[in-house]
Amino acid sequence: MPKVMKDVVHPLGGEEPSMARAVVRSVGGFTLGLSLATAYGLLELLVEGHSPWGCLVGTLTLAAFLSLGMGFSRQVRATVLLLLPQAFSRQGRTLLLVAAFGLVLQGPCANTLRNFTRASEAVACGAELALNQTAEVLQRAKQPLVSALNKIKAIARKTKEVADRVRKFFRSIMDGVKHIARALRNVWQWLLHIGDVCNSELGNPYLKCARVFDDAKDSCMMVIPQAYHLCYVLMPFKLALCGLASLVQVFCVIPKYIQPFLRQTIGTPVIQLLNRVRQEFEFNMTATHHFSVDLNASRSLSQVAMDLHEAVSMKLHRVREALALMGFTTPLLLVLLYLQALFYRYCYLNWDHYDNIYITSRFLRMEAVRSTAGLPTVLPLSAHEARRYIPPGSIFLSQWEKFFYILETFNLIRHLLLVLFLVFLDYAVFWVLDLARHQLQGEIVARSPVLVSLTVEGTGYAGNIYRDLVSAFDVLQQGNISILSRRCLLRPSEPDSTGYIVIGVMYGLCFFITLFGSYVSRLRRVICASYYPSREQERISYLYNVLLSRRTNLLAALHRSVRRRAADQGHRSAFLVLASRCPCLGPFVSHFWLHQAYCLGCGQPQDEGDMENTVSCSTPGCQGLYCLTCFRLLDNTCSVCASPLSYQGDLDLELDSSDEEGPQLWLAAAQRKDPEQAWLLQQQLQEVLGRSLSMESTSESSDLDEEKGPQQRKHGQQPLPEAHQPVSILTSPEPHRPPETSSATKGAPTPASEPSVPLSPPSLPDPSHPPPK
């Protein structure tokens, strides 16, 4: 059938709605659009917990689209109405599972991550508390030494003050001594240099006096060289006067003899005395203490705690981002459902085989019209067709619906197990952390069990030092260590019961969709049929033609199946066929394989006690055994012995010169049914085999078979080969002309039609691609 490419198929002239109905539909669509937008806004605000402004903007946008679209557009109205049952389809259930799992991620998973974060914060606080307590213990351990050092420093400061005073006193003494020394040095220098000054000022008196008289003598001798002997008159005066001048030389010689005496007797002892006094006031004070604490760690405990907290935060950053994105699943869900509704509407208008498996009331009316007109019909359906094609209101599911029903049930169970595990994990983590909080909610402080008191008596610097040391040990004993503090108390986050109720409701809705989604999804075809009735009539005609075409091909396939199983003598397996060919395997096969009769048409096993549902061929010597359905499809004629009579056409028979049983059975059946047809069949067989055939042997075998009776013929049946569904063998239709006394189903197949709707030949769908749901 040609595909309909128009999106809108207007109804027939008699069904065109009036103006009043159009107004009512527009008002109803406008109201329904506003209601749906309001429900979406409440869902986003109350369930998802989004911001009011974001919910307001989204609700107004959706309300404008839905109300105006459903009020003034027939296509939008049909698509939105399709969206409601589309939510109960397999794709809608999948999207609802995604939304529910998003709530699970935002609820239990986020709460579990929050509890892990709080646990890491408590661990970091405990590490910092341990660091502070360790530093405090170290400070208290250093306290005795620090006190001793402080006392020593105080003594040193006081000693320094005394030393400063002694230094000032010594400096005063030194200044006085230096003043005396300077005076003595001046005297010493005067005594040291007085001889030189005396000699430089006065010279040697005797020598100077003698030099004066000598100079006078020389001058005289130069003046009066002739009377130089007169110049020697001065010599007596020289001796007398210069002898008196030598007495003054004693004063210049005395300091030379006094200076060494003063150096040895006064200078050296005084210097030694001063040095000895200086040494008495010089002293060295050395205080040495050693205190070393080695902590082999590259990082401090506070840094380790902060690094631990940052590492946990970095690990959870992407998870938190994903959880934040899960809050926008509802708009995405609505958009995808709307796109799926558009896709279903497009497929309904353009693909004849899409979701076309329902036997509707229009289909039944077409069947009644064709039955009244004497045309071939398709009802009742075969067992295989009944599993595929169902009425829309039937409580039974089609074959594909059952398959998807089982698949979706297992998928839902898998999701429920995962969600239950996440919920259990949330409660387990909270229970463990809450138990730890309950056990550690107190405060533990380590105190010294025994206090030792020491008293130091005495005065002086040493007593003060020992007294300070003892007081420092008292401080060390009285110090308390906080092992557990309320500041680091773990406060786990309690699971949200309201969120769990919402999650339970959503998964309950998923379970409802899994159970009844197939029935609700059938409303999509009802909605499209109400909006596009002419398109629905075309789809029904297409389905009727498909069934009628398969019914015609079914008869030819059933004839071939019967002939094939009759050639194999009714054996189902290759081993039984081999045993029939080799007589030596017969006892072995009969010992292990029980005898069972099978329908030659469909291969269904037949119970020996239920003979009401089986039909045996009445022709003598024929092994034909059929179920009621196959025998009705064969026009109540055995296809083994009477196929040339019931299936007119070319003799497509595999015969050779040694085949005697088949032609004799055909002639016997023809003789019983119509002697004239028996004569014609005999002529055709003689032409095919190239020899003459007589009916005498046939009549003899007929007499023998009549004596055996039908009960012995039933026990003489051999096991039949494996059943094949007749509808799975698609062949080209062959001409078939049943007798005039047959029912309407025996007539020649013609395209299904109604007086007012012309039909075209059907285009068979691909068996490997079943129609999607």
From Swiss-Prot:
Q: How does it sit in the membrane?
A: Multi-pass membrane protein
Q: Per the record's keyword annotation, is Glycoprotein included, yes or no?
A: yes
User: Per its UniProt entry, which superkingdom is the organism in?
Assistant: Eukaryota
Q: Name one GO biological process term.
A: sperm-egg recognition
Q: What is its main location?
A: membrane
Which parts of this chain are annotated as the region Disordered?
A: 692-773
Cite the ranges annotated as topological domain Extracellular. 48-51, 255-322, 437-499
User: Which Pfam families does UniProt cross-reference here?
Assistant: DC_STAMP
Write out the function statement from the record: Essential sperm cell-surface protein required for sperm-egg fusion and fertilization.
> Assembly state and interactors?
Interacts with DCST1.
The molecule here is called DC-STAMP domain-containing protein 2
Q: Which organism is it from?
A: Homo sapiens (Human)
Q: Which gene encodes it?
A: DCST2
